[in-house]
Amino acid sequence: MAGRNWLDTFGRAKSLDVNADLDRGYEAALLIQSLELEYYGDRPIRPDLELSVPSSVQATVLRKFRAAISVCRASLDKLEYQRGELDPQELRQLQLIESVVNRYSPRRTASAPTISRSPDPLPRSLLGIFDTLRRQLNPTAEATLVAGFRRRRDSTLISLKVLLLLILVPLLVQQVSRTYIISPAVDRYAPDLPFLSYPKPQLEEQAVEKLRVYKAEIEFDALLRGDSIPTQEELQKKLSAKAEELKQEADSESTHAVKNVIADLAATVAFVVVCVFSREELRVLRGFFDEAVYGLSDSAKAFAIILFTDIFVGFHSPEGWTVLLDGIANHFGFPARENFILLFIATFPVILATIFKYWIFRYLNRVSPSSVATLRGMNGGG
């Protein structure tokens, strides 16, 4: 049993090393691609090419490139013999690292100026078949596949666990702290600290309207029953009691915003604490989301994109933004200004749509052209 536990611990440590090497290499490859796209027009980086930027900026770019390509090569050397343990998403990340390393390999750079090169002794596809057979006939192939399955299973369980923690811990902290700590403390010190129950004009207007309706209801009930309308003294007494009740209700509502703000701050602190103590799990969660997203078909990706854009920047999105802004204003105790809401609806969805189209043009069109083509077809060719 002790030997099995030691082997499990060693396997988990090895899995973490593989994930760390893959993440470092993948981030370095993405950095190189971003440098190519930003400074070299989506072409390979050439140290001998003079850019139309200051020399200090070009030196920084080349320094980042050299550091990133060295990280990619080191990661590729370490991951070369771990292919069987990688899931499809990790294999795609490894292929990206390989493509970047091959693009800047010395052999490729040296042979770039030539028009043709000597043919390989054997076709690459035939070599790939031999390599596949070699891996399948390897005595450790079954153990490698089982280790890869266990690692993917552990990755899924860790991702679900940290996702539940990120959702439930801040929510529970917010509700429990607001109910048992913040609300009693604010109610206790609100009479002595005026800023905890600052006056709100909209609450006063609502109280006046409720008092006017209450007076009309008294007179209407008296007329329905056939009784005489209450005298001025009786009406004044009832209105005074109702006004006191409305005042207490307004005072209670005026502290809700302060309670909500403090409870939200406590939830934010809890969220940050969970993130700080779950950094390794968050990296696993990011890989899980990447695998889920990239594992979708092109039609599913296009459908999700169209659904997202129609909800937030589509024809019916102004109604949703209005409800959302009203809820946020009520949560924090701000008056719902119609002019601000209309200005927000007229500008923010447009900015969001522009950012989204730019993302499609710069990133999605290069990473998944088939998804862009499917998106255009489902969107009516636009």
Curated annotation (Swiss-Prot):
Ordered alphabetically, the record's keywords are:
Cell inner membrane, Cell membrane, Hydrogen ion transport, Ion transport, Membrane, Transmembrane, Transmembrane helix, Transport
Q: Which GO terms describe its cellular component?
A: plasma membrane
Give GO terms: molecular function aspect only.
proton transmembrane transporter activity
Lipid biosynthesis: is it a keyword of this entry? no
Q: Where are the transmembrane segments?
A: 156-176, 257-277, 305-325, 340-360
Q: Is Ion transport included in the keywords of this UniProt record?
A: yes
Instruction: Provide the membrane topology annotation.
Output: Multi-pass membrane protein
What does this gene product do?
Answer: Required for H(+) efflux immediately after light irradiation to form a rapid H(+) concentration gradient across the thylakoid membranes. Together with PxcL, contributes to transient H(+) uptake following dark to light transition.
Give the family this protein belongs to, as stated in its UniProt record: Belongs to the CemA family.
Q: What is this protein called?
A: Proton extrusion protein PxcA
- The gene name on file is pxcA
